[in-house]
Amino acid sequence: MAQPELLWAAAGLMLLGVAVSACVRCQLYATKRGKDGSQGSRLERPQRFEVIRSCSAVTRRPERIKEPEHLARKAPEELSTSCHVGFESSAEPRYQNFLTEDCLHEDAAYVEPVPLDYYSHNRFFSPPNDEDSHSYQNVIIGDPCSSELDDAEDYENSTAIEVWKVQQAKAMLYAESQDEEPDYVNTDPTIDAVVLSK
């Protein structure tokens, strides 16, 4: 064999040995970890169940609060007034001033929460009960007033409108008088211009 071939064979065997030793170490580590994990999980499982099944209740009773010896115990009347007054002295810790149920009922500044009916908009979408629900409030039912005279004064070309109305009336009379009715009536544009210029 040649020398380069021997070097390649030796390098391949070394790589194969490293791979086998890595696999053996991983397998030993996994079995060791599995044994330790199973023993640890056996020890941890009862504790987990105890934590899940245990429960604690928190109560707020002034009689059972442990206070430092240098602070005097407040009477219930003082506690109810202290919840209204607030944090007056900075010598007392903040957690001593807690609200009792009586304070919420006696507090004049307490505002009841908004009821859910306030936010329901059903009253806006329901039809009104009046029989005249579709009429407008600002419409006066009565004789219709003719606004033709008022409209004539509003426009600058009111004279042209009056001339046009007269011509339309003449055209209608002319059309009715003839046996065959034309689709339209041709009028002389110079006559209209003379009338408009007056």
Curated annotation (Swiss-Prot):
Q: What is this protein called?
A: Linker for activation of T-cells family member 2
Q: Any idea what job this protein has?
A: Involved in BCR (B-cell antigen receptor)-mediated signaling in B-cells. May also be involved in FCER1 (high affinity immunoglobulin epsilon receptor)-mediated signaling in mast cells and FCGR1 (high affinity immunoglobulin gamma Fc receptor I)-mediated signaling in myeloid cells. Couples activation of these receptors and their associated kinases with distal intracellular events such as calcium mobilization through the recruitment of GRB2.
Query: Which ranges make up the Extracellular topological domains here?
Result: 1-4
Q: What is the effect of changing C23A?
A: Abolishes phosphorylation following BCR activation
**Where are lipid groups covalently attached, annotated S-palmitoyl cysteine?**
C23, C26
Where exactly are the transmembrane stretches of this chain? 5-24
Q: What positions are modified (Phosphotyrosine)?
A: Y136, Y155, Y184
The organism of origin for this protein: Gallus gallus (Chicken)
- Record-linked InterPro entries: LAT2
- Cytoplasmic compartment: which residues? 25-198
> Among the entry's GO cellular component annotations, what is one?
plasma membrane
Q: What PANTHER family would the database entry show?
A: LINKER FOR ACTIVATION OF T-CELLS FAMILY MEMBER 2 (PTHR15646:SF5)
Q: What is the topology of this protein in the membrane according to its UniProt annotation?
A: Single-pass type III membrane protein
SUBUNIT field: When phosphorylated, interacts with GRB2.
